[in-house]
A protein has these predicted regions:
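Terminal presequence/propeptide segments associated with secretion/organelle targeting
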Residues: 1-355
Length: 355
């Protein structure tokens, strides 16, 4: 039996919602984090100091990156979209056979399809935007934290937020962060429509001739927020430092403006989707009234129980539930040079000697 907090699930989402989750949200996370983590990992393998700084945040980033990869693989393998389409077709026929349900449920699937299609570009842009900038360079995270710092909070809350901010700064390597910043700017510009670009991109084109590296170097050389000194000047109310003139803050504000624009453009479709997803769920429950519907996870504690066993991820491949010495040596040979599969020499000696 296991006990834990499973986050959230969306098991009753429409086929159109699953498509969007797969192609917008998940793909953004897969693409962008692969780029960011590759930069981090390269630096971590070259320096123990960097590895120690970045190990925890690399693991946190990789967690939902792997989750998104696995989710997309499972959606395809299990034909989730096809199964949902069949259910939705059955629902359409059921609605047509029941005159009393037509006024309530007729058209919900057509509206869902139209609304998801209408908002797709914005949803995809928002997904990449969040991964590239809100979850990208740590300078942006620091600047956002300073911009939103609540100096009127209770003392205990204030102390905790100061601690978190100083910990963030303590674990930033600015050279690595610059590489991430440049990569994020490039990736976002490469995958979205021109109208989804913020004014920062026009500045880069005009002032820096499209050179992302030059823009990032200039930003880091002029901001006070690349270290705690900018925050200290805000706390001390240094009259010679104007927070809103700091280039990192200017970048954050520009990103916020574009984020709100993208979000507002999808408001009508968002409301239609929320309404019709709810009606779809209600209609399916009426159609299959003799079936048990388990609730979605909502971050509250859950219990699960069953038998421990292996699994078969694909045809002709079997995984047991335990690890063998042979399996460890096979992985060492197969992934030679990959730090994720390195084993300490002393442990290898013990295994070889069957100690």
């Amino acid at each position: 039996m296991t006990m834990g907090y499973p986050g959230t699930t969306s098991r009753y989402l429409s086929s159109y919602g699953v498509e969007e989750r797969m192609n917008a949200d998940n793909m953004a996370r897969i693409d962008v984090r692969a780029i960011k983590q590759a930069i981090w990992k390269d630096a971590m393998e070259k320096s123990d100091a960097v590895r120690i700084k970045y190990a925890s945040k690399y693991a946190q980033s990789a967690n939902y990156w792997k989750n998104s990869i696995g989710m997309n693989q499972s959606i395809k393998k299990l034909n989730i979209i096809g199964k949902k389409r069949r259910l939705e077709h059955q629902l359409t026929e059921w609605i047509h056979r029941k005159p009393e349900e037509r006024n309530k449920y007729a058209g919900i699937l057509t509206e869902l399809e139209d609304s998801y299609r209408n908002r797709y570009k914005n949803a995809r842009a928002m997904a990449y935007f969040g991964e590239c900038f809100a979850n990208g360079p740590e300078l942006v995270t620091a600047a956002w934290s300073v911009l939103n710092f609540d100096f009127e909070a209770e003392k205990s809350v204030l102390e905790e937020r100061v601690r978190q901010l100083l910990e963030l700064y303590a674990n930033i390597d600015l050279d690595i962060d610059k590489k991430v910043f440049v990569a994020m700017l490039k990736e976002y510009a490469a995958v979205v429509e021109p109208e989804s670009l913020s004014e920062t991109y026009a500045t880069i084109e005009k002032k820096f001739k499209g050179d992302y590296q030059a823009y990032v170097d200039d930003l880091y050389s002029h901001t006070e927020l690349d270290t705690p000194r900018g925050f200290e000047r805000v706390v001390k109310k240094d009259s010679t430092y104007v927070l809103f003139e700091d280039p990192a803050i200017s970048f954050v504000i520009d990103m916020l403006v574009k984020s709100y624009e993208l979000s507002a453009a999808a408001d009508d479709d968002n409301m239609k989707i929320e309404k019709n997803e709810r009606l779809l769920n209600e209609a399916v429950r009426e159609m299959e009234s003799d079936k048990d519907f388990y609730p979605d996870a909502n971050s509250t504690m859950r219990f699960s129980f069953g038998m421990i066993g292996g699994y078969s991820p694909k045809d002709a491949l079997e995984y047991t539930y335990y690890t063998t010495t042979k399996g460890i040596f096979d992985k060492i040979r197969e992934y030679k040079g990959d730090s994720d599969f390195e084993v300490m020499p002393s442990v290898i000696d013990l295994l070889e000697n069957r100690d």
